[in-house]
A protein has these predicted regions:
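Sec-dependent N-terminal signal peptides of Gram-positive bacterial secreted proteins and lipoproteins
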Residues: 2-23
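Solvent-exposed hydroxyl-ligand-binding patches built from regularly spaced Ser/Thr
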Residues: 25-218
């Protein structure tokens, strides 16, 4: 009886060790941002939400976001049981499929609530980004910055189809600094177009905002 109990205890301990080892071997793949706040300098283009509260006519407060990116090689190296952090949550990997234009995890987000769809960047097929509902690219908040306006600011608002091709929309508009804030507010009131990080990029040159571009899917 004692020998049996000793054998049973050893078997249980072995199972526990195997379980712990399996848990330790499971790894988490996290995205990296395409933007480094500390390295922005005087000339840069970033994804940002334009804050229009207040009456400041000389500049804008920007909430800056970095696009969440993944290495294709890192994604393909994932195994069942591993985890990937995408769209604000961890997903346990069950299967990975290479599809046209990218990689689907667990069937992709269109087929499965627990799925993740990663798309290759147009200019870099070895780098992937994650898309959320309505094809918004998943991004991470990096910090806030105040930037003054240049003497003239180009505002571009375009509607895009599901593949990112322009459908037309509003012509480019060149505004004076005092006209920018009212224009952004009016765009929301008239057309419900928000200048948020999901669809907005802001260009700064020589330390001043020169262009704000919105690409939205109607």
């Amino acid at each position: 009886m004692k020998k049996f109990l000793a054998f049973l205890t050893a078997a249980v301990l072995a199972c526990c060790v195997l379980s712990v080892c399996a848990a330790e071997e499971s790894r988490l793949l996290e995205p990296y941002a395409d933007t480094d706040m500390e390295a922005l300098g005087q000339d840069y283009t970033v994804r940002a939400t334009c804050l229009t509260d207040g009456t400041d006519e000389k500049g804008l407060d920007l909430m800056i976001f970095g696009k969440d990116l993944y290495s294709r090689a890192d994604v393909l190296a994932l195994r069942p049981g591993d985890r990937i952090f995408a769209n604000g949550a961890e997903t346990v990997v069950e299967k990975i499929d290479e599809v046209e234009g990218g990689i689907d995890i667990n069937g992709g987000y269109l087929e499965n609530n627990d799925g993740v769809s990663l798309f290759a960047l147009p200019d870099d097929p070895d780098t992937l980004c994650s898309c959320m509902e309505d094809d918004y690219i998943s991004s991470t908040f990096l910090g806030e910055a105040y930037e003054p306006f240049a003497e003239q600011i180009r505002i571009s608002v375009y509607s895009m189809d599901e593949e990112g091709n322009p459908l037309g929309g509003y012509d480019e508009t060149v505004l004076r600094p005092e006209e920018v804030r009212p224009f952004i507010q009016r765009m929301y009131e008239d057309s419900y177009i928000e200048f948020n990080y999901s669809v907005t990029t802001v260009t700064v040159q020589n330390g001043a905002i020169t262009e704000i571009r919105v690409d939205y899917a109607p």
